[in-house]
């Protein structure tokens, strides 16, 4: 260094809790945010559409849906909205009514399905909103459309993190899973903490739901379903 005295009065580098990033790469369908030491990446058209990291805590959020032939919540059109960003998904389909009379054959493939009445166009929409706050992000999900659709959000968490919730504390082991039926939970790696919730669920299915995609074995899965 030729002139060390020129750097003597510079302020100390900001810690990760003060480091802020806010960048939308619209052409690539990517969003990069950082607040309070928590980093977030949003990706369009991927089942795992949110990735987050704070210190040694790494996890993703993946969306699945049971709606006709739709199984993945593939978010699209990440865009600015108020103080944050939003993205959306729309699934469509139609239900074929029974024939109502014998078709002259028991072979499903030989039947004239153009004669069947349908329910008409049905759709379900999901909108996720990400708003930066002082110590992280406020993430909210809205759904509307076909009322009987079942939607799941899965949190995949790297091992060696302790999961603390109402009435339980368990390690995030590879291949493990739980359904958080109520309340908040914390992800704790011995140094940093990430709070998630509230969670809720209306069924007891833990694995093999919807065919959203095979679980990533090195990760622990936490699922919310509604």
Task: Pin down the residues of each PLM region.
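Beta-strand-rich recognition/accessory modules
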Residues: 179-226
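Extended polysaccharide-engagement surfaces of secreted carbohydrate-active enzymes
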Residues: 1-190
